[in-house]
Regions:
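Generic N-terminal amphipathic, Lys/Arg-enriched alpha-helix
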Residues: 1-15
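Glycine- and other small-residue-rich loops at beta-strand/loop junctions that grip anionic moieties
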Residues: 17, 75, 114
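Residue-level signature of catalytic and energy-coupling elements of molecular machines
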Residues: 25, 86, 130
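Short active-site-adjacent helix-start/loop capping segments
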Residues: 52-54, 83-85, 103, 121-122
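Glycine-rich active-site/cofactor-binding loop and its immediate structural neighborhood
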Residues: 66-103, 109
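Long, charge-patterned amphipathic alpha-helical coiled-coil/hairpin "stalk" segments used as oligomerization
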Residues: 91-179
Length: 179
Protein backbone atom coordinates (compact mmCIF):
# COMPACT_ATOMS: atom_id res chain seq x y z
CA UNK A 1 0.00 0.00 0.00
CA UNK A 2 1.35 3.40 -0.95
CA UNK A 3 1.75 5.83 1.96
CA UNK A 4 0.87 9.48 1.67
CA UNK A 5 3.32 12.19 2.68
CA UNK A 6 1.51 12.79 5.98
CA UNK A 7 1.39 9.06 6.78
CA UNK A 8 5.13 8.71 6.17
CA UNK A 9 5.79 11.64 8.50
CA UNK A 10 3.55 10.11 11.18
CA UNK A 11 5.08 6.64 10.92
CA UNK A 12 8.42 8.01 12.16
CA UNK A 13 6.87 9.36 15.39
CA UNK A 14 5.85 6.02 16.90
CA UNK A 15 6.54 2.29 16.72
CA UNK A 16 3.55 0.05 15.94
CA UNK A 17 5.11 -2.91 17.75
CA UNK A 18 5.66 -1.04 21.02
CA UNK A 19 3.14 -0.78 23.87
CA UNK A 20 2.50 2.67 25.32
CA UNK A 21 1.08 3.81 28.64
CA UNK A 22 -2.19 5.72 28.53
CA UNK A 23 -0.39 9.03 29.18
CA UNK A 24 2.08 8.36 26.34
CA UNK A 25 -0.72 7.30 24.00
CA UNK A 26 -2.69 10.50 24.68
CA UNK A 27 0.42 12.60 23.97
CA UNK A 28 0.95 10.66 20.71
CA UNK A 29 -2.66 11.24 19.62
CA UNK A 30 -2.33 14.98 20.20
CA UNK A 31 1.09 15.25 18.51
CA UNK A 32 0.18 13.20 15.41
CA UNK A 33 -3.01 15.08 14.52
CA UNK A 34 -2.95 16.32 10.92
CA UNK A 35 -6.60 16.50 9.86
CA UNK A 36 -8.73 19.62 9.81
CA UNK A 37 -11.54 18.09 11.90
CA UNK A 38 -11.72 16.91 15.50
CA UNK A 39 -10.72 13.23 15.33
CA UNK A 40 -12.30 10.52 17.46
CA UNK A 41 -10.09 8.63 19.87
CA UNK A 42 -10.83 4.91 19.92
CA UNK A 43 -9.60 2.41 22.44
CA UNK A 44 -8.85 -1.20 21.46
CA UNK A 45 -7.94 -3.59 24.28
CA UNK A 46 -7.00 -7.22 23.73
CA UNK A 47 -8.29 -9.00 26.82
CA UNK A 48 -7.22 -12.47 25.73
CA UNK A 49 -10.57 -14.03 26.67
CA UNK A 50 -12.70 -16.42 24.66
CA UNK A 51 -16.23 -14.95 24.45
CA UNK A 52 -17.65 -18.34 23.43
CA UNK A 53 -17.36 -19.32 27.10
CA UNK A 54 -20.09 -17.71 29.18
CA UNK A 55 -17.80 -17.12 32.16
CA UNK A 56 -15.33 -15.15 29.99
CA UNK A 57 -17.91 -13.01 28.20
CA UNK A 58 -17.73 -9.34 29.22
CA UNK A 59 -20.58 -6.92 28.65
CA UNK A 60 -21.03 -3.76 30.69
CA UNK A 61 -21.98 -0.12 30.47
CA UNK A 62 -20.12 2.82 31.94
CA UNK A 63 -20.42 6.59 31.86
CA UNK A 64 -17.51 8.66 30.63
CA UNK A 65 -16.85 11.78 32.74
CA UNK A 66 -16.80 14.15 29.75
CA UNK A 67 -18.90 12.14 27.28
CA UNK A 68 -17.71 10.85 23.92
CA UNK A 69 -17.89 14.16 22.09
CA UNK A 70 -20.63 12.74 19.88
CA UNK A 71 -24.23 13.94 19.85
CA UNK A 72 -26.29 10.81 20.55
CA UNK A 73 -29.75 10.63 18.96
CA UNK A 74 -32.16 8.78 21.25
CA UNK A 75 -35.55 7.29 20.35
CA UNK A 76 -37.89 6.51 23.25
CA UNK A 77 -40.64 4.00 22.52
CA UNK A 78 -43.33 4.49 25.15
CA UNK A 79 -46.88 5.70 25.57
CA UNK A 80 -48.91 7.82 27.96
CA UNK A 81 -47.37 10.14 30.56
CA UNK A 82 -43.87 8.71 30.03
CA UNK A 83 -43.75 10.51 26.65
CA UNK A 84 -43.61 13.89 28.40
CA UNK A 85 -40.83 12.64 30.72
CA UNK A 86 -38.80 11.51 27.71
CA UNK A 87 -39.19 14.85 25.91
CA UNK A 88 -38.23 16.75 29.07
CA UNK A 89 -35.11 14.56 29.46
CA UNK A 90 -33.94 15.47 25.95
CA UNK A 91 -34.97 12.52 23.78
CA UNK A 92 -34.81 13.32 20.06
CA UNK A 93 -37.74 11.12 19.03
CA UNK A 94 -40.59 9.97 21.28
CA UNK A 95 -43.60 7.73 20.73
CA UNK A 96 -44.67 4.35 19.45
CA UNK A 97 -45.50 5.78 15.99
CA UNK A 98 -41.78 5.42 15.19
CA UNK A 99 -42.21 1.61 15.20
CA UNK A 100 -43.67 1.81 11.68
CA UNK A 101 -40.70 3.90 10.51
CA UNK A 102 -38.29 1.36 12.02
CA UNK A 103 -40.01 -1.44 10.08
CA UNK A 104 -39.25 0.36 6.82
CA UNK A 105 -35.54 0.56 7.65
CA UNK A 106 -35.34 4.05 9.17
CA UNK A 107 -32.30 4.18 11.45
CA UNK A 108 -31.56 7.84 12.14
CA UNK A 109 -31.00 7.00 15.84
CA UNK A 110 -27.99 5.85 17.84
CA UNK A 111 -29.88 4.33 20.80
CA UNK A 112 -33.42 3.14 21.46
CA UNK A 113 -34.92 3.22 24.96
CA UNK A 114 -38.21 1.45 25.71
CA UNK A 115 -40.55 0.78 28.59
CA UNK A 116 -41.21 -2.89 29.43
CA UNK A 117 -44.83 -2.66 28.22
CA UNK A 118 -43.61 -1.78 24.70
CA UNK A 119 -41.17 -4.69 24.39
CA UNK A 120 -43.68 -7.14 22.84
CA UNK A 121 -44.13 -4.73 19.92
CA UNK A 122 -40.39 -4.00 19.69
CA UNK A 123 -39.64 -7.73 19.84
CA UNK A 124 -41.27 -8.13 16.43
CA UNK A 125 -38.56 -5.82 15.04
CA UNK A 126 -35.71 -7.96 16.40
CA UNK A 127 -34.52 -8.99 12.94
CA UNK A 128 -34.28 -5.33 11.90
CA UNK A 129 -32.86 -3.82 15.10
CA UNK A 130 -30.63 -6.68 16.29
CA UNK A 131 -27.99 -6.60 13.53
CA UNK A 132 -27.75 -2.80 13.84
CA UNK A 133 -27.16 -3.02 17.60
CA UNK A 134 -30.26 -0.95 18.34
CA UNK A 135 -32.41 -3.52 20.17
CA UNK A 136 -33.19 -2.31 23.71
CA UNK A 137 -31.82 -4.56 26.45
CA UNK A 138 -32.46 -4.56 30.23
CA UNK A 139 -28.79 -5.37 30.91
CA UNK A 140 -27.64 -2.21 29.14
CA UNK A 141 -30.33 -0.10 30.81
CA UNK A 142 -32.32 0.65 27.67
CA UNK A 143 -35.43 -1.25 28.83
CA UNK A 144 -36.51 0.64 31.92
CA UNK A 145 -39.35 2.42 33.67
CA UNK A 146 -36.99 5.32 34.54
CA UNK A 147 -37.03 6.83 31.06
CA UNK A 148 -35.70 10.26 32.01
CA UNK A 149 -32.66 8.85 33.85
CA UNK A 150 -31.80 6.50 31.02
CA UNK A 151 -32.07 9.23 28.36
CA UNK A 152 -29.92 11.62 30.43
CA UNK A 153 -27.27 8.89 30.89
CA UNK A 154 -27.15 8.12 27.16
CA UNK A 155 -26.97 11.80 26.21
CA UNK A 156 -24.17 12.48 28.72
CA UNK A 157 -21.85 9.75 27.43
CA UNK A 158 -22.89 6.30 28.63
CA UNK A 159 -21.12 3.68 26.51
CA UNK A 160 -21.43 -0.07 26.21
CA UNK A 161 -18.32 -2.24 26.36
CA UNK A 162 -18.61 -5.65 24.79
CA UNK A 163 -16.06 -8.31 23.88
CA UNK A 164 -15.89 -9.11 20.17
CA UNK A 165 -15.35 -12.65 18.91
CA UNK A 166 -11.54 -12.31 19.03
CA UNK A 167 -11.48 -11.24 22.69
CA UNK A 168 -10.98 -7.55 21.87
CA UNK A 169 -12.97 -4.58 23.19
CA UNK A 170 -13.34 -1.56 20.86
CA UNK A 171 -14.86 1.67 22.12
CA UNK A 172 -14.83 5.37 21.24
CA UNK A 173 -13.66 7.20 24.35
CA UNK A 174 -13.49 10.83 23.23
CA UNK A 175 -12.11 13.37 20.79
CA UNK A 176 -8.52 14.44 20.19
CA UNK A 177 -9.34 17.94 21.44
CA UNK A 178 -10.23 16.69 24.95
CA UNK A 179 -7.74 17.67 27.66
Amino acid sequence: MKLTKNRKKLSTKFNRDESYTIEEAVKLVKSTKYTSFDESVDLAINLGVDPRHADQNIRLTTSLPHGTGKDVKVLVVTQGPKEKDAKDAGADYVGKEFLEKLKTGWDDVDKIVATPDMMPELGKLGKVLGPKGLMPNPKSGTVTTDISGSVRDLKSGKIELRVEKNGIVHVQCGKSSFD
